[in-house]
Structure formats: C-alpha cells, structure tokens
A protein has these predicted regions:
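Tryptophan-anchored aromatic micro-motifs
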Residues: 25-51
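Short, solvent-exposed loop/hinge segments that bridge or flank secondary-structure elements
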Residues: 42-69
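Hydrophobic/aromatic beta-strand elements that line small-molecule binding cavities or substrate pockets
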Residues: 59-65, 91-96, 121-123, 156-161, ...
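Mid-chain, structured segments of secreted extracytoplasmic proteins
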Residues: 65-106
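An exposed acidic His-Trp-rich patch
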Residues: 93-145
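Edge beta-strand at a domain terminus
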Residues: 119-124, 165-198
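Helix-rich interaction surfaces within compact, conserved domain-sized segments
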Residues: 133-175
Length: 198
C-alpha cells in the first residue's frame, strides 16, 4: 500500500513539474530588446512616401542606450538633416512597462537640449502582441497634444516596434501614412554621441 501511494505521489509531482509556465510575449519582447543594451546599429528608411523625402538615402543609427527592468531608451540619429546639415540627434524612443502592458513615448529635443513643443507623445499596448512585435495606439494625452498644436491628423496614429533575430523596425501608420525605418542587427556600429539634452 505504501509503495502504491509513493508511486502515485511521484506521478503527481512529475505531472506538476512538466507543466510549463505561461509565457508572456511582452516580457519576451522587452528581454529581446534589453539583450542589445549598449549596442548601436546602422539602418535606413524602409518606407517610400513623399513626406519622408528628406530622410531618403540618409545614414541612420539606433542606439539601445539605457536599460532598466522597466525602461529602455533608444535614441534615433539621422545624418544630413540636423540644423547644421549634420546629424539630427533630436529623437529618443522610450519603452516602459506599465501595470497593463508596455508604453512607447517619443522624447524630442532641440539642439540646445530644450524640449520640443511636440514631445512625450505615444501610446500603450492594447493587447499582448507577440515576442517580436508590439503595437502602440495613440493615447488620450497625445491626442490632446496633437489637437492643441494643430496636428490632429496624428490623432489616429498607431506605432509599432519589431525586433527579430536580424533586425529592429520602428513604424508609424494611420490612414494615408506609412513610415518605417529598419536597422540591421548584423551591422553594429560605434555608439553615437548622446542625443540632444541627455
């Protein structure tokens, strides 16, 4: 009898041990980006709209500059479009954890480090997404900012961030608008200077 009970207990414990923990796509996504912390990569414009003509053919660099368990800062540098014709270091993508998912915000600065009128806009995830792709519909705070600054065309923005084994892609979409830049993880480059104001 004791042997039978011991065997039954062993079977029960084995069954418990074999049950895998449920995976969280957003945790996996966050970890995948964090794995690149401190590294910078070359990129390019991947979309083809007239609104982005000034960026076409320009050198681009993304830098996973700072990572904590709840926040990742990714400056986005573009050559040839700065105020002096050099590098524009005005943009930083900030991804943070929230109680309900992930949040993407855009920190925009002027060359003197002061904040742009249009800064800290973005949105929160509305679903779990996948380990390689998260989308961020515009939030109420950003809609208010866009409306106040005469940019209500952006009130339906949806941003996306993708990270795969080979690349990182940032995107913006809304009706009539498609903007994408992609960076090759196989082309690491020297980390650039700090973004303006940081």
């Amino acid at each position: 009898m004791k042997t039978a009970l011991a065997f039954a207990a062993a079977i029960t414990l084995t069954g418990c041990a074999a049950t895998p923990a449920a995976s969280n796509p957003q945790d996996e996504f966050f970890a995948a980006l964090t794995a690149h912390c401190g590294k910078a990569y070359a990129g390019k414009l991947a979309s083809n709209q007239d609104a982005d003509a000034d960026m076409r053919g320009k050198a681009m660099v993304m830098h996973v500059r700072s990572c904590t368990p709840d926040r990742i800062e990714i400056p986005f540098h573009i050559d040839g479009v700065g105020p002096d014709g050099g590098w524009d270091r005005s943009r930083t993508w900030i991804i943070t954890r929230t109680a309900t998912g992930l949040r993407l915000k855009h920190d925009h600065r002027h060359a003197d480090g002061s904040k742009d009128e249009l800064t800290m806009y973005g949105g929160d995830t509305a679903n779990a997404g996948t380990a390689s792709r998260q989308t961020f519909p515009v939030d109420a705070e950003s809609i208010a900012l866009f409306t106040r600054t005469g940019r209500s065309v952006s009130n339906t923005n949806i941003w996306s961030v993708e990270t795969t084994a080979d690349s990182f892609t940032y995107g913006l979409s809304r009706e009539g608008r498609d903007f994408r830049v992609t960076f090759d993880y196989r082309q690491p480059v020297a980390p650039p200077p700090a973004p303006w104001g940081w």
